[in-house]
Amino acid sequence: MSATQFDEARRVSTSVLTSSERRCLLWLASRLPRWINSDHLTMLALLAMLMTGVSYSLARSHPLALVLAVVWLAVNWFGDSLDGTLARVRGHQRPRYGFYVDHVVDCFGVLFLLAGLALSGYMSPLVAMGLLVAYFMLSIEVYLATYCLTVFRLSFWGFGPTELRLVLAIGTLALLFDPTVDLVGQRYRLFDVGGLAATAGLAITLVVAVIRNVRALYQAEPLPALAKAGR
C-alpha cells in the first residue's frame, strides 16, 4: 500500500493556546536526542494516562496521590503533543499510522483516566461513564468528519486537549482543599459538577458539529433535482 494514495486531512486548531504551544513544541522537538522517536513519545503518553488513572484511584485513600495525577497529566501532554511535532520536524511523517495509533491511544487513555476517577471517590461512576460515552461519541463524529470532509478538527469553542488538561489539573489540585462545591444550598462533589458540565458541553458540541457537517456534505452531494411533472 503506497503512502502516496493517502490524502492527509487538513488540521484545524483554534484553541486558546495553539500558537504558544506550537512554538514550545517546535523548541522541544529540535532539542530531543536522536534516539528518541515519535513512537517512544506515543507510548509515553499512553503510560502517563494509565498512571494518571492509577493515581486518581489511589487518591481514594491517599489524597496526595492527586499531585501525582497532575504530574502524569503533564507527562501525557509532553508525549501526546510532541510525537506528531517530532515526526514533522524530522520529516518522518507516517500519516495513516500516526493518525490511527495516536487516536487509538487517546481512546484508551481517556478510558484509563475516567476509570481512575470512577474509582477515586471524587467522581460518581455514573458521571464518569456518561462523560466517557459523550467523549467517544464526539470522537467518532470527528473521525467520520475527517474521513468525509478531509478536515481534522483538534479543538472546539477555543478548547483543545491542552486546555482540557489544564482545567483538569487545576480542578485536581482544588480537590486537595475541598472536594465539594456548594450549589443552591446543597453540597455536591466538585468533579460530579464538572463532569456533568463537561458531558453537556461535549453533547452540545456533538449536535452542532453533526448539523454543520451534514449541511456541508448535503451541499456537496445534493439529491438530483426531481423531474418536472409531465415530463
Regions found by a protein language model. Name each.
Residues 1-71, 115-231:
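Hydrophobic alpha-helical transmembrane segments
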